[in-house]
Amino acid sequence: MAKHLFTSESVSEGHPDKIADQISDAVLDAILAQDPKARVACETYVKTGMVLVGGEVTTSAWVDIEEITRKTVREIGYTHSDMGFDADSCAVLNAIGKQSPDINQGVDRADPAEQGAGDQGLMFGYANNETDVLMPAPITYAHALVKRQSEVRKNGTLPWLRPDAKSQVTFAYDDGKIVGIDAVVLSTQHRDDVSQADLIEGVMETIIKPVLPAQWLNKDTKFFINPTGRFVIGGPVGDCGLTGRKIIVDTYGGMARHGGGAFSGKDPSKVDRSAAYAARYVAKNIVAAGLADRCEIQVSYAIGVAEPTSISIETFGTGKVSEDLLIKLVRQHFELRPYGLTAMLDLARPIYQATAAYGHFGRNEFPWEATDKAEALRADAGL
């Protein structure tokens, strides 16, 4: 493999699309806390001075959509009208209805194990051994940059920061191995009274240098900090935000393929979300077991049918055993029917708001990041 560059981006919790994702998942969590069997599909739209929460829900729970929305926006940091978006004064519109009974009859079964998929679709899971969390380095460090921006904004280290921010990191590879970081982009919303010089110094010394490993930075690494020179207008004033519009940020930063389905606002019966989590769990355990250095798995489903319609695995020439054997091991060790994978990963509980910013993968607090199957996979592979 020749030398090449690869780039991934991330966005902060204050980015308009991420505000929408977090509100959708906050509503989902509130419902699941009361009714773990609820069916939820919650979509959010944010723009200057308003939030629209819509979707389809079937549940015995009652939740206060307006209060959940305001609390979420407040925690993100939009608390002043001079930002153009204020948790306490924005309009909150509720357009949630009931899920179609046609979907219910396809999903629900007398035997829970035979629960059908909530929709057709294809999902991918991926892992590689570039980082200790078995994730691609570009997306891992792109997330780390905007997460650090949030930390130093909230703890007052850089009091002129505001919630909206974006990062982008370009890694240089040689023969598939990382040899350095070629370029770093970080754009952050800020107060009007900070100078460009102070902003660049603060971001470099307080955000970039503490996050990016020094051994990957060199004299040729390029840094672009607020390259337009000014980022005062941001958040929902600058752009409208929608749930599900940051699916590459949410997953592998473009290094793996994506089936197209978004995650936030969806309960575990929606395989767009739950099967993508299960696919990550499978891929990570295959890499953790040493059966491949890189692994991508695809699963697909038909609405109302429990068994996956297909399972395929690609190891990009790094596999230690055949891909046919890997598929056999996956069928043997992992439950990929909707009810089974929900039980396997304990997904019917309120854990989702935390996923809605800084990536759904590579964060060990989530159950799909466990590597508890690695030893058994390795043994059964004969290694």
From Swiss-Prot:
Main enzyme class: transferase
Gene Ontology BP terms: one-carbon metabolic process; S-adenosylmethionine biosynthetic process
Transmembrane segments: none
CDD domains according to UniProt: S-AdoMet_synt
Binding site for L-methionine: 56, 99, 239, 270
Binding site for ATP: 15, 164-166, 230-231, 239, 245-246, 262, 266
Keyword set includes Magnesium: yes
Region described as Flexible loop: spans on this chain: 99-109
Binding site for K(+): 43
Metal-binding is among the record's keywords: yes
Cofactor(s) listed: Mg(2+); K(+)
Alphabetized UniProt keyword annotations: ATP-binding, Cytoplasm, Magnesium, Metal-binding, Nucleotide-binding, One-carbon metabolism, Potassium, Transferase
Pathway entry: Amino-acid biosynthesis; S-adenosyl-L-methionine biosynthesis; S-adenosyl-L-methionine from L-methionine: step 1/1
InterPro entries (alphabetical): ADOMET_SYNTHASE_CS, S-AdoMet_synt_C, S-AdoMet_synt_central, S-AdoMet_synt_N, S-AdoMet_synthetase, S-AdoMet_synthetase_sfam
Co-factor binding comment: Binds 2 divalent ions per subunit.
Reactions listed under catalytic activity: L-methionine + ATP + H2O = S-adenosyl-L-methionine + phosphate + diphosphate
Domain of life: Bacteria
GO molecular function, one term: magnesium ion binding
EC code: 2.5.1.6
GO cellular component, one term: cytoplasm
Binding site for Mg(2+): 17
Family note: Belongs to the AdoMet synthase family.
Subunit structure: Homotetramer; dimer of dimers.
Entry protein name: S-adenosylmethionine synthase
Organism (species): Shewanella baltica (strain OS185)
Gene: metK
